[in-house]
Amino acid sequence: LGISLLTTIAFFEINTINKQIKAEKNLIAASEKDLFLYRQMGASYLCIASKAEVDFKKGLGIASATFANVIIGKHGGAIKELGNQKLDQKKLYNAGTFQIVGSALNICPESIPKKIKNDYKKRLKELAKGSKK
């Protein structure tokens, strides 16, 4: 009985590991539609949190971390637009922060601190200049 139970447990663990490996191989890069959904969810969370008087930086941090975690968990950090390149947690967090603030400015501009608005606009101009080169 002990050996058959041990064999069953070992087989179950190997089977679980194989399923995880197969799942990782089947990850599909995040499309623009996926990114839009995750960005809008983050912005919605940020707006609701701000209106509930949650500290803005904490709310933005949670929204950005969730954005990054979903892309890593569901898409392995891959974004269709970038080809085979996979982004790490930090890059996705930073990209999410920028994109979530941009969307939140459209949804609830009154909830975004002035300094954050100004920083966003400045960074957007820098990116626009960089893309023209």
Give residue ranges: language-model regions.
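Intrinsically disordered, low-complexity linker/tail regions enriched in Pro/Ser/Thr
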Residues: 14-33, 129-130
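Short N-proximal segments of mature Sec-exported proteins
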Residues: 24-84
